[in-house]
Amino acid sequence: MTEQEDTFSAVRFHKSSGLQNEMRLKETRKPEKARLRVCSVPWQLIVIALGILISLRLVTVAVLMTNIFQYGQQKHELKEFLKHHNNCSIMQSDINLKDELLKNKSIECNLLESLNRDQNILCDKTRTVLDYLQHTGRGVKVYWFCYGMKCYYFVMDRKPWSRCKQSCQNSSLTLLKIDDEDELKFLQLVVPSDSCWIGLSYDNKKKDWAWIDNRPSKLALNTTKYNIRDGGCMFLSKTRLDNNYCDQSFICICGKRLDKFPH
Protein backbone atom coordinates (compact mmCIF):
# COMPACT_ATOMS: atom_id res chain seq x y z
CA MET A 1 0.00 0.00 0.00
CA THR A 2 1.30 3.35 -0.91
CA GLU A 3 1.68 6.31 1.36
CA GLN A 4 -1.24 8.11 -0.27
CA GLU A 5 -3.46 5.15 0.30
CA ASP A 6 -2.44 4.99 3.93
CA THR A 7 -3.17 8.65 4.34
CA PHE A 8 -6.57 8.32 2.67
CA SER A 9 -7.43 5.34 4.82
CA ALA A 10 -6.42 7.20 7.94
CA VAL A 11 -8.53 10.18 6.92
CA ARG A 12 -11.49 7.96 6.17
CA PHE A 13 -11.11 6.17 9.44
CA HIS A 14 -10.84 9.43 11.27
CA LYS A 15 -13.91 10.80 9.54
CA SER A 16 -15.89 7.69 10.11
CA SER A 17 -14.92 7.63 13.77
CA GLY A 18 -15.91 11.26 14.11
CA LEU A 19 -19.20 10.60 12.43
CA GLN A 20 -19.85 7.67 14.66
CA ASN A 21 -19.04 9.71 17.76
CA GLU A 22 -21.27 12.53 16.58
CA MET A 23 -24.02 10.05 15.89
CA ARG A 24 -23.65 8.57 19.34
CA LEU A 25 -23.71 12.06 20.92
CA LYS A 26 -26.91 12.95 19.06
CA GLU A 27 -28.49 9.68 20.01
CA THR A 28 -27.48 10.32 23.62
CA ARG A 29 -29.03 13.85 23.62
CA LYS A 30 -32.32 12.80 22.04
CA PRO A 31 -33.55 10.87 25.10
CA GLU A 32 -32.55 13.76 27.35
CA LYS A 33 -34.58 16.19 25.26
CA ALA A 34 -37.42 13.72 25.21
CA ARG A 35 -37.23 13.41 28.96
CA LEU A 36 -37.21 17.19 29.29
CA ARG A 37 -40.29 17.43 27.07
CA VAL A 38 -41.99 14.65 28.97
CA CYS A 39 -41.13 16.27 32.31
CA SER A 40 -42.30 19.73 31.22
CA VAL A 41 -45.82 18.55 30.28
CA PRO A 42 -47.08 17.87 33.88
CA TRP A 43 -45.93 21.30 35.09
CA GLN A 44 -47.87 23.00 32.33
CA LEU A 45 -50.97 21.03 33.27
CA ILE A 46 -50.49 21.96 36.94
CA VAL A 47 -50.10 25.64 36.06
CA ILE A 48 -53.25 25.53 33.90
CA ALA A 49 -55.18 23.71 36.61
CA LEU A 50 -54.03 26.20 39.24
CA GLY A 51 -55.03 29.05 36.98
CA ILE A 52 -58.46 27.54 36.50
CA LEU A 53 -58.87 27.00 40.26
CA ILE A 54 -57.80 30.56 41.04
CA SER A 55 -60.20 31.87 38.39
CA LEU A 56 -63.01 29.79 39.86
CA ARG A 57 -62.23 31.07 43.35
CA LEU A 58 -62.18 34.64 42.12
CA VAL A 59 -65.53 34.10 40.41
CA THR A 60 -66.90 32.46 43.59
CA VAL A 61 -65.67 35.35 45.74
CA ALA A 62 -67.19 37.83 43.30
CA VAL A 63 -70.52 35.98 43.38
CA LEU A 64 -70.44 35.82 47.18
CA MET A 65 -69.66 39.53 47.45
CA THR A 66 -72.49 40.28 45.04
CA ASN A 67 -74.90 38.12 47.06
CA ILE A 68 -73.76 39.73 50.32
CA PHE A 69 -74.31 43.18 48.87
CA GLN A 70 -77.73 42.20 47.52
CA TYR A 71 -78.64 40.61 50.86
CA GLY A 72 -77.63 43.77 52.72
CA GLN A 73 -79.63 45.89 50.31
CA GLN A 74 -82.67 43.60 50.58
CA LYS A 75 -82.36 43.60 54.37
CA HIS A 76 -82.29 47.40 54.40
CA GLU A 77 -85.31 47.53 52.07
CA LEU A 78 -87.13 45.02 54.29
CA LYS A 79 -86.39 47.13 57.38
CA GLU A 80 -87.69 50.22 55.61
CA PHE A 81 -90.80 48.33 54.52
CA LEU A 82 -91.44 47.00 58.03
CA LYS A 83 -90.85 50.47 59.47
CA HIS A 84 -93.29 51.95 57.00
CA HIS A 85 -95.75 49.13 57.69
CA ASN A 86 -95.45 49.67 61.46
CA ASN A 87 -95.97 53.39 61.00
CA CYS A 88 -99.06 52.67 58.93
CA SER A 89 -100.31 50.25 61.58
CA ILE A 90 -99.73 52.84 64.31
CA MET A 91 -101.48 55.50 62.26
CA GLN A 92 -104.39 53.15 61.61
CA SER A 93 -104.59 52.34 65.32
CA ASP A 94 -104.61 56.06 66.12
CA ILE A 95 -107.36 56.61 63.56
CA ASN A 96 -109.40 53.75 65.01
CA LEU A 97 -108.88 55.09 68.52
CA LYS A 98 -109.93 58.58 67.49
CA ASP A 99 -112.99 57.17 65.74
CA GLU A 100 -113.87 55.24 68.89
CA LEU A 101 -113.38 58.35 71.03
CA LEU A 102 -115.55 60.39 68.68
CA LYS A 103 -118.17 57.67 68.79
CA ASN A 104 -118.08 57.65 72.60
CA LYS A 105 -118.22 61.45 72.68
CA SER A 106 -121.22 61.37 70.38
CA ILE A 107 -122.92 58.84 72.66
CA GLU A 108 -122.10 60.98 75.71
CA CYS A 109 -123.47 64.07 73.98
CA ASN A 110 -126.67 62.23 73.13
CA LEU A 111 -126.98 61.04 76.72
CA LEU A 112 -126.38 64.55 78.04
CA GLU A 113 -128.99 65.94 75.69
CA SER A 114 -131.41 63.27 76.83
CA LEU A 115 -130.63 64.02 80.48
CA ASN A 116 -131.07 67.73 79.90
CA ARG A 117 -134.44 67.11 78.28
CA ASP A 118 -135.48 64.86 81.16
CA GLN A 119 -134.20 67.39 83.68
CA ASN A 120 -136.08 70.22 82.00
CA ILE A 121 -139.25 68.13 81.97
CA LEU A 122 -138.79 67.30 85.64
CA CYS A 123 -138.08 70.92 86.51
CA ASP A 124 -141.24 72.03 84.74
CA LYS A 125 -143.28 69.39 86.57
CA THR A 126 -141.62 70.36 89.86
CA ARG A 127 -142.51 73.99 89.36
CA THR A 128 -146.08 72.89 88.72
CA VAL A 129 -146.13 70.90 91.97
CA LEU A 130 -144.64 73.76 93.99
CA ASP A 131 -146.97 76.31 92.43
CA TYR A 132 -149.92 74.05 93.24
CA LEU A 133 -148.83 73.73 96.86
CA GLN A 134 -148.42 77.47 97.19
CA HIS A 135 -151.78 78.29 95.56
CA THR A 136 -153.64 75.84 97.77
CA GLY A 137 -152.14 77.42 100.84
CA ARG A 138 -150.14 74.33 101.64
CA GLY A 139 -146.97 75.71 100.18
CA VAL A 140 -143.94 76.13 102.40
CA LYS A 141 -140.48 77.52 101.90
CA VAL A 142 -138.74 75.08 99.57
CA TYR A 143 -135.56 75.24 97.55
CA TRP A 144 -134.46 72.57 95.12
CA PHE A 145 -131.89 71.75 92.47
CA CYS A 146 -130.96 68.87 90.18
CA TYR A 147 -127.55 67.26 90.02
CA GLY A 148 -126.68 64.33 87.77
CA MET A 149 -129.53 61.83 87.70
CA LYS A 150 -131.30 63.14 90.77
CA CYS A 151 -133.20 66.21 91.97
CA TYR A 152 -133.15 67.35 95.61
CA TYR A 153 -135.89 69.24 97.46
CA PHE A 154 -135.24 70.92 100.79
CA VAL A 155 -138.46 71.59 102.72
CA MET A 156 -137.38 74.24 105.19
CA ASP A 157 -140.44 73.80 107.44
CA ARG A 158 -139.18 71.75 110.41
CA LYS A 159 -141.11 68.56 111.02
CA PRO A 160 -140.77 65.19 112.73
CA TRP A 161 -139.45 62.35 110.57
CA SER A 162 -142.89 60.84 109.85
CA ARG A 163 -144.34 64.20 108.73
CA CYS A 164 -141.32 64.81 106.49
CA LYS A 165 -141.97 61.43 104.91
CA GLN A 166 -145.60 62.40 104.34
CA SER A 167 -144.71 65.83 102.91
CA CYS A 168 -142.42 64.22 100.35
CA GLN A 169 -145.08 61.68 99.39
CA ASN A 170 -147.66 64.46 98.94
CA SER A 171 -145.37 65.92 96.25
CA SER A 172 -144.81 62.52 94.57
CA LEU A 173 -141.35 62.39 96.11
CA THR A 174 -139.65 60.33 98.82
CA LEU A 175 -137.38 61.11 101.71
CA LEU A 176 -133.87 61.12 100.30
CA LYS A 177 -131.98 57.89 99.79
CA ILE A 178 -128.21 58.37 99.54
CA ASP A 179 -126.80 55.98 96.94
CA ASP A 180 -123.05 56.13 97.60
CA GLU A 181 -120.18 57.86 99.37
CA ASP A 182 -119.71 60.46 96.62
CA GLU A 183 -123.31 61.60 96.93
CA LEU A 184 -122.93 61.85 100.71
CA LYS A 185 -119.87 64.10 100.39
CA PHE A 186 -121.64 66.24 97.80
CA LEU A 187 -124.73 66.68 99.98
CA GLN A 188 -122.66 67.69 102.99
CA LEU A 189 -121.39 70.60 100.91
CA VAL A 190 -124.86 71.86 99.96
CA VAL A 191 -127.11 71.09 102.93
CA PRO A 192 -128.15 73.98 105.18
CA SER A 193 -126.39 74.44 108.48
CA ASP A 194 -129.25 72.69 110.29
CA SER A 195 -129.85 68.95 110.49
CA CYS A 196 -132.04 67.35 107.81
CA TRP A 197 -134.09 64.18 107.93
CA ILE A 198 -133.29 61.56 105.27
CA GLY A 199 -135.00 58.32 104.30
CA LEU A 200 -133.09 55.97 106.62
CA SER A 201 -134.67 54.54 109.76
CA TYR A 202 -134.47 51.51 112.04
CA ASP A 203 -136.67 48.56 111.04
CA ASN A 204 -137.85 46.84 114.22
CA LYS A 205 -138.89 43.72 112.30
CA LYS A 206 -135.55 43.27 110.55
CA LYS A 207 -133.62 44.56 113.55
CA ASP A 208 -131.51 46.65 111.20
CA TRP A 209 -131.34 50.05 109.52
CA ALA A 210 -133.30 50.24 106.26
CA TRP A 211 -133.79 52.81 103.52
CA ILE A 212 -137.21 54.15 102.68
CA ASP A 213 -137.51 51.93 99.55
CA ASN A 214 -136.33 48.83 101.47
CA ARG A 215 -133.51 48.38 98.96
CA PRO A 216 -129.77 48.25 99.65
CA SER A 217 -127.45 51.18 99.00
CA LYS A 218 -123.80 51.31 97.92
CA LEU A 219 -123.21 53.69 100.80
CA ALA A 220 -121.08 51.80 103.32
CA LEU A 221 -122.46 52.51 106.79
CA ASN A 222 -121.02 51.20 110.02
CA THR A 223 -124.45 50.65 111.54
CA THR A 224 -122.98 49.16 114.71
CA LYS A 225 -121.96 52.62 115.89
CA TYR A 226 -125.57 53.83 115.82
CA ASN A 227 -127.29 52.99 119.10
CA ILE A 228 -131.01 52.54 118.65
CA ARG A 229 -131.51 53.96 122.13
CA ASP A 230 -130.40 57.32 120.74
CA GLY A 231 -133.21 57.31 118.18
CA GLY A 232 -134.48 55.30 115.26
CA CYS A 233 -134.29 57.91 112.49
CA MET A 234 -131.24 59.17 110.59
CA PHE A 235 -130.40 62.81 109.86
CA LEU A 236 -127.73 64.50 107.77
CA SER A 237 -125.68 67.59 108.58
CA LYS A 238 -122.60 69.24 107.11
CA THR A 239 -120.36 67.29 109.47
CA ARG A 240 -121.95 63.90 110.04
CA LEU A 241 -124.60 61.30 109.41
CA ASP A 242 -126.22 60.35 112.72
CA ASN A 243 -129.39 59.05 114.36
CA ASN A 244 -131.85 60.83 116.62
CA TYR A 245 -135.34 60.44 118.01
CA CYS A 246 -137.89 60.44 115.22
CA ASP A 247 -140.15 62.99 116.95
CA GLN A 248 -137.47 65.67 116.70
CA SER A 249 -138.25 68.43 114.18
CA PHE A 250 -135.69 68.87 111.39
CA ILE A 251 -135.63 70.12 107.80
CA CYS A 252 -136.81 67.55 105.25
CA ILE A 253 -134.77 66.41 102.24
CA CYS A 254 -136.87 64.85 99.49
CA GLY A 255 -135.42 63.35 96.35
CA LYS A 256 -136.32 61.75 93.04
CA ARG A 257 -134.31 60.22 90.22
CA LEU A 258 -134.87 61.53 86.71
CA ASP A 259 -135.53 58.04 85.37
CA LYS A 260 -138.24 57.53 88.02
CA PHE A 261 -140.18 60.64 87.10
CA PRO A 262 -143.10 60.04 84.68
CA HIS A 263 -142.66 61.57 81.22
From Swiss-Prot:
InterPro entries registered for this protein in UniProt: C-type_lectin-like (IPR001304), C-type_lectin-like/link_sf (IPR016186), CTDL_fold (IPR016187), Ly49_N (IPR013600), Mouse_KLRs (IPR052013), NKR-like_CTLD (IPR033992)
Residue intervals annotated with topology Extracellular: 66-263
A biological process from GO: cell adhesion
Effect of residue 5 to K: In strain: NOD and NOR
Gene Ontology CC annotation, any one: cell surface
Keyword Disulfide bond: yes
GO MF annotation list: carbohydrate binding
Chain ranges passing through the membrane: 45-65
PANTHER family, alphabetized: KILLER CELL LECTIN-LIKE RECEPTOR 2, KILLER CELL LECTIN-LIKE RECEPTOR 4-RELATED
Entry function: Receptor on natural killer (NK) cells for class I MHC.
The protein, known as: Killer cell lectin-like receptor 4
